[in-house]
């Protein structure tokens, strides 16, 4: 069985279309995917997110609502993963930005021996359509540079499409501390420490309007989270031999930034990013 976790904060407008497309896709690819259930994690939404999720429940695609009172995408994904019980568990964003054809590819990779399969917008065969302004694109580039220092060998940590062996990821998220948008980085670090074989696959990705990530509001916090992750996972020993990804980077920890309070860590982290080579 495959369970798909969808974190949702005030997603009453975008979620119905995503669930409709997912239901059609699952019906057309039942042979490759098998039985599928969706876990929509209502992240303390102020709108009708939970209601539209329940309305989408059907025999063709069962939809279950999981409630998460702690705000933050990382907290919501963690709650959904812990509520799962399937052999294969995925999470994807509520906006449906990643093409669903990646599901069959990911499931097949798991059958061939991968433990974790993540969508990557940075691979040569990926097709992306972004509408970011220059300032957001520059911030994203700096963030990627830093994230790669914590997850060497992984090209794109932040794509909202990841598929896991259920037992492995449920164990990994037990100690997950990052509640915000940088949770992917901590999760990947912990999975590597657990010896997981991580593979990246190319995806089709479209920037869907209405993102809940607002750079002015969340950008500094995301950088500070990276510093906290570097600090909280210090001393852990990942197994780089188990990572299969396109492109490699040498690990370079950030002890100076990680040891500082968040208010000070952010400018230090940004400074390190600007000084580091591509």
Spans of features found by a protein language model:
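Hydrophobic helical membrane-anchoring modules
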Residues: 1, 175-278
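Hydrophobic targeting segments
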Residues: 1-6, 15, 22, 36-41, ...
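Short, well-formed alpha-helical segments that are part of the catalytic scaffolds
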Residues: 11-27
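Donor nucleotide-sugar binding loop of glycosyltransferases
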Residues: 11-14, 45, 73, 99
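Conserved donor nucleotide-binding strand/loop of the catalytic core
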Residues: 32-33, 37-39, 50-83
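A conserved acidic beta->alpha catalytic loop
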Residues: 42-50, 96
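Acceptor/aglycone-binding surface of glycosyltransferases and processive sugar-polymer synthases
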Residues: 68-83, 88, 100-181, 208-217
């Amino acid at each position: 069985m495959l369970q798909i976790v969808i974190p949702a904060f005030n997603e009453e407008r975008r979620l119905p279309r995503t669930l409709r497309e997912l239901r059609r896709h699952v019906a057309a690819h039942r042979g490759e995917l098998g039985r599928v259930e969706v876990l929509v994690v209502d992240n303390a939404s102020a709108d009708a997110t939970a209601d539209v999720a329940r309305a989408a429940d059907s025999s063709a695609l069962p939809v279950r609502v999981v409630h998460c009172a702690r705000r933050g995408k990382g907290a919501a994904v963690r709650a959904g993963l812990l509520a799962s019980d399937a052999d294969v568990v995925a999470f994807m964003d509520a906006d449906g930005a990643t093409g669903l054809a990646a599901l069959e590819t990911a499931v097949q990779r798991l059958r061939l021996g991968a433990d974790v399969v993540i969508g990557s917008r940075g691979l040569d065969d990926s097709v992306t359509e972004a509408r970011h302004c220059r300032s957001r694109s520059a911030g994203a580039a700096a963030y990627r540079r830093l994230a790669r220092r914590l997850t060497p060998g992984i090209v794109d940590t932040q794509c909202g499409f990841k598929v896991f062996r259920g037992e492995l990821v449920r164990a990994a998220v037990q100690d997950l501390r990052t509640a915000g948008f940088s949770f992917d980085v901590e999760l990947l670090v912990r999975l590597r420490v657990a010896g997981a074989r991580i593979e990246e696959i190319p995806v089709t990705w479209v920037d869907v309007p209405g993102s809940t990530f607002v750079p002015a509001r969340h950008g500094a916090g995301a950088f500070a989270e990276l510093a906290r992750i570097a600090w909280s996972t210090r001393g852990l020993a990942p197994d780089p031999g188990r990572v299969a990804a396109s492109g490699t980077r040498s690990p370079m920890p950030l002890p100076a930034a990680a040891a500082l309070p968040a208010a000070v860590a952010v400018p230090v982290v940004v400074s390190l990013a600007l000084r580091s080579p591509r």
